[in-house]
Swiss-Prot record:
The modification N6-(3,6-diaminohexanoyl)-5-hydroxylysine is found at K34. One of its GO terms (molecular function) is translation elongation factor activity. Gene3D superfamilies: 2.30.30.30, Nucleic acid-binding proteins. Pathway: Protein biosynthesis; polypeptide chain elongation. One of its GO terms (biological process) is peptide biosynthetic process. Involved in peptide bond synthesis. Alleviates ribosome stalling that occurs when 3 or more consecutive Pro residues or the sequence PPG is present in a protein, possibly by augmenting the peptidyl transferase activity of the ribosome. Modification of Lys-34 is required for alleviation. This is Elongation factor P. It comes from Vibrio atlanticus (strain LGP32). Belongs to the elongation factor P family. May be beta-lysylated on the epsilon-amino group of Lys-34 by the combined action of EpmA and EpmB, and then hydroxylated on the C5 position of the same residue by EpmC (if this protein is present). Lysylation is critical for the stimulatory effect of EF-P on peptide-bond formation. The lysylation moiety may extend toward the peptidyltransferase center and stabilize the terminal 3-CCA end of the tRNA. Hydroxylation of the C5 position on Lys-34 may allow additional potential stabilizing hydrogen-bond interactions with the P-tRNA. Keywords: Cytoplasm, Elongation factor, Hydroxylation, Protein biosynthesis. One of its GO terms (cellular component) is cytoplasm. It is found in: Cytoplasm.
C-alpha cells in the first residue's frame, strides 16, 4: 500500500489514521523559529463523520486510504438500504442508513450521487449540489404579507423542510442547494 508524508498533505487527501480512513479538510504547515516543523491538520474521519484537529511532525508517513469516489444513480429505498446503480455497467450497490445519514432528505430518484467506497463498501453518500424537488405541503402566501423575512416553511416530496418565498405553492418544483439546505429558485 502506498504511503504519504506529512510534507505532501493537502486538502482532499485521504489517508489512514488509527485504522480508519480520514480526509484532510485543511492543512497548515508551521515552521517555528526554534524546534521542528509540524503540520496542523483539520480532518474528517470518514466512518464516523467526526471532524478533528491534529498536529503531526514534519516528515511523518501515513498509509494512503484505499478509498474510491464513484458516481452512481439513486434508485430507491427499501426501508433498510438505499440502492444505487452505475449507469454504464448497471451494477447495483446498496448503502445502509448510516452511510446515507443526513443525505437521505436530498435523494431524488435517478439523480447522480457520489458514493465513497472503502473496501468496496459505501461509507458516505453525497447528493448532487443542487436538487429539484416538488413542494408537497406549504401554507398559502397571503397577499401583502411582506413583514419579517418574507418566507415560509415548505415540506418537499423527500420530507425535507426548506424556507421558500411566499409565492411558492403546493405542486411547484423548487431548486435547493443540498450543502446549505437553502431555496435557490423555482423550476419552470
Amino acid at each position: 500500500m502506498a504511503s504519504v508524508s506529512t510534507n505532501e498533505f493537502k486538502g482532499g487527501l485521504k489517508f489512514m489514521l488509527d485504522n480508519e480512513p480520514c480526509a484532510i479538510i485543511d492543512n497548515e504547515y508551521v515552521k517555528p523559529g526554534k524546534g521542528q516543523a509540524f503540520n496542523r491538520v483539520k480532518l474528517r474521519k470518514l466512518l464516523s463523520g467526526k471532524v478533528l484537529e491534529k498536529t503531526f511532525k514534519s516528515g511523518e508517513s501515513f498509509e494512503l486510504a484505499d478509498v474510491v469516489d464513484v458516481e452512481l444513480g439513486y434508485l430507491y429505498n427499501d426501508g433498510e438500504f438505499y440502492h444505487f446503480m452505475n449507469n454504464e455497467t448497471f451494477e447495483q450497490i446498496a448503502a445502509d442508513v448510516k452511510a446515507v445519514a443526513d443525505s437521505a432528505k436530498w435523494l431524488v430518484e435517478n439523480d447522480v450521487c457520489t458514493l465513497t467506497l472503502w473496501n468496496d463498501n459505501p461509507i458516505t453518500v453525497t447528493p448532487p449540489n443542487f436538487v429539484e424537488i416538488e413542494v408537497t405541503e406549504t401554507d398559502p402566501g397571503l397577499k401583502g404579507d411582506t413583514q419579517g423575512t418574507g418566507g415560509k416553511p415548505a415540506t418537499l416530496a423527500t420530507g425535507a423542510v426548506v424556507r421558500v418565498p411566499l409565492f411558492i405553492a403546493i405542486g411547484e418544483v423548487v431548486k435547493v442547494d443540498t450543502r446549505t439546505g437553502e431555496y435557490v429558485g423555482r423550476v419552470k
